[in-house]
Amino acid sequence: MMFNKFICASAVLMMSALAYGCTSLPESSRTATIHDVKVEEKLSPSTIRVQPGDEVRWVNVRKLPVQVEVPTVTTDDLSCQRGFSNWMGSFREIGRIKPNETVALCFKKPAIINYSVRAETSLGGGMQVLPGTVEVGGR
């Protein structure tokens, strides 16, 4: 009986530690300034200027899913994220967006972030790559 209590207590402790270790970045902007990038046949706008802490939100207005890829970004560069985490809450560099849905990132410090959006197309090749840039801070 005592052994069962020990196992239960250990399991609860492990689950608590796992939940604490998997905490991720906040899902909203601290500055409350949100900048939308619409994903259509092209990005609108393809270059966006924001301040540190602002939220950049990609909006998929296409009829099929797309994915936003930010290969040079790490969690150290971010103050918030939504849609760029795996099932354990860890950041990943690809955010998948269903039609009429969004993903978002908030950048901590001045930087120039080049990203791309991959979208299915009826044109030859099957995938269209739409390049974009986020300029954080500065002017």
Q: What is each residue range found by the language model?
A:
Residues 26-56:
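N-terminal edge beta-strand
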